[in-house]
Amino acid sequence: MSKWVYPILSIPEDKLAKAVIKNIDASVRDLYNVCKAIRGMNLKEAREFLNNVLEEKEALPFWRYSHGTSHRSNISRKWKVKSGRYPKKAIKYVLKLLDNAENNANSKGLDIDNLKIVHIAAHKGLVLKRYMTRAFGRSTRKYKYLSHIEVILGEV
C-alpha cells in the first residue's frame, strides 16, 4: 500500500492546516476544474464563489475536460474562458473539505480571516469493478470511479 504524502511547501508547518477526503463518489474531471478555480483564493472568497456556483448565479469555468461544454454568459472575464458548468456534487465535497481544513486551522490557533488556499488537488481513487447480468448468460462490466481531494491552507 502506498503512503499518503502532502507536497513540500516553503511555508513553516505551524502556519499550515491540512485536510484530505479519500474515496468520494465524484468525478475527477469536475474536481480538477473546481480545484483549479479556487487555488490561490482566500478561504472566504472561495466559499462565496462556490456557493454562487451552487445557486447557479455564476458558472464554474472548465479549462480541461471541456469538450462539448457550452459557453455560459455568467462567467467572469477574469477566467479568460467561455465554457463552464455547474458541478454541484463536486462542489459539495470541496466545501466539506474546506470546512474540515478550517476546523484544523482553528484547532492549531491560526487566524481564520487570513487563511489562503496554498495547495488543492484532486486525484484518481479506487475503481470498484462490478458485473451486471445480461440476457443469455452474459454479463457486462460496470465500473465506479472514486476520487481523492487534498487541501492545504496557509496563514498569510
Curated annotation (Swiss-Prot):
GO molecular function terms attached to this record: rRNA binding; structural constituent of ribosome
Keywords: Ribonucleoprotein, Ribosomal protein, RNA-binding, rRNA-binding
Gene Ontology annotations of biological process type: cytoplasmic translation
Entry's Gene Ontology cellular component terms: cytosolic large ribosomal subunit
Gene3D superfamilies assigned to the protein according to its UniProt record, in alphabetical order: Ribosomal protein L22/L17
Name of a matching Pfam family: Ribosomal_L22
Coiled-coil boundaries: none
Origin: domain of life: Archaea
Keyword match Ribosomal protein: yes
Function noted in UniProt: This protein binds specifically to 23S rRNA. It makes multiple contacts with different domains of the 23S rRNA in the assembled 50S subunit and ribosome. The globular domain of the protein is located near the polypeptide exit tunnel on the outside of the subunit, while an extended beta-hairpin is found that lines the wall of the exit tunnel in the center of the 70S ribosome.
Subunit composition and interactions: Part of the 50S ribosomal subunit.
HAMAP family: Ribosomal_uL22_A
Family statement: Belongs to the universal ribosomal protein uL22 family.
NCBIfam families for the chain: PRK04223.1, uL22_arch_euk
PANTHER family noted in UniProt: 60S RIBOSOMAL PROTEIN L17
Name recorded for this polypeptide: Large ribosomal subunit protein uL22
Organism listed in the record: Sulfolobus acidocaldarius (strain ATCC 33909 / DSM 639 / JCM 8929 / NBRC 15157 / NCIMB 11770)
Gene assigned in the entry: rpl22
